[in-house]
Amino acid sequence: MKAKVIVGMSGGVDSSVAAWLLKEQGYQVEGLFMKNWEQDDHNDYCPAAKDLADAQAVCNQLRIPLHTVNFSKEYWDRVFAYFLSEYEKGRTPNPDVLCNKEIKFNAFLNHALTLGADYIATGHYAKNTIEGSIGYLFKAKDREKDQTYFLHAVEPEALSKTIFPIGDFTKPQIREFAKQLGLVTHAKKDSTGICFIGEKRFKTFLNEFILAKPGEIKSTGGKTLGQHDGLMFYTLGQRQGLGIGGLQNSTDEPWYVVDKDIASNTLYVAQGSQHPMLYSQGLICGPIHWLADYENHLPLTCFAKTRYRQTDQACMISPPDNNQHYVMFSSPQRAITPGQFIVFYEKNQCLGGATIEQIIR
């Protein structure tokens, strides 16, 4: 009997096809649906209920059992509390990275092992290789959909217990498989945005948990231009929603957020999408979570992304200084955002990543 694999079934097309591919390869396949968020249950439309129904329908079609588990407490403690604390500091976190690290490749993995799994699998667009108890992470065939940026914080030991069945396929191929199989998820839209917010407006959602502190919007020259609703609602490079268009004798170019001064609660803006204040030559990041043995090879020249779907940018990582690293880029980078992640690559391999702490102009 081939190994037992438990697939994280989200109710989407990617995990549906992942389960089918594993079954075709002869694995003993079971599904598991994770509920990670309780807040939506009072709504008329609950996405979690629809996703569970779709996951169950797919498992019925594939004739595999579906387990369910509630990780809402773990999610709140390990992901959402961090998400809120970062926004309270005026930073812009990425909860998907932490959700993968703490929930999908930790809580889910441990739960699956108690159910007798040899491996877990997910519908992520990524690839890995396994050497003993260590897994190495590589980009998916579909570069447009590659999700290694969100997986860089997963432990190498967890990657050694993981299979990524769809990593060698493109999204159109996955949809075509699902359509040919008649899976109920074949035409389901990809989920977008932060999983626990769903269709809510982001501002409305944050207001439920954090007290907003309005303050001044100023030009880079120090001129007061208006009022902001709270620094947490704005991110570097943002253009929409500033409410200061068409001001006194200014050029017609739009305004962009270029800085946030937490101490004075001031939002700084400048005109023009190419304004120098939007660009940084480098950044300071926290400790690097390494997925490959490069820790003792610093300084290191490699490539990096400071946001999802950015093309790889040439950079140099310095040796650690006080548990931080300086990363300098070959060309200036636009709208690098503290609280987000920088993820490092060498060709197709994901080397690891770190939290962006400061920008270096």
Swiss-Prot record:
The active site is at C99 (nucleophile), C195 (cysteine persulfide intermediate). Residues 94-96 are annotated as: Interaction with target base in tRNA. Residues 145-147, 307-308 are annotated as: Interaction with tRNA. It catalyses: S-sulfanyl-L-cysteinyl-[protein] + uridine(34) in tRNA + AH2 + ATP = 2-thiouridine(34) in tRNA + L-cysteinyl-[protein] + A + AMP + diphosphate + H(+). Its main location: cytoplasm. One of its GO terms (molecular function) is tRNA-uridine 2-sulfurtransferase activity. ATP binds at G8, M9, S10, G11, G12, V13, D14, S15, M34, G123. Pfam families: tRNA_Me_trans, tRNA_Me_trans_C, tRNA_Me_trans_M. It comes from the Bacteria. InterPro entries: MnmA-like, MnmA-like_C, MnmA-like_central, MnmA-like_central_sf, Rossmann-like_a/b/a_fold. This is tRNA-specific 2-thiouridylase MnmA. It comes from Legionella pneumophila subsp. pneumophila (strain Philadelphia 1 / ATCC 33152 / DSM 7513). The lineage of its organism: Bacteria, Pseudomonadati, Pseudomonadota, Gammaproteobacteria, Legionellales. The gene is mnmA.
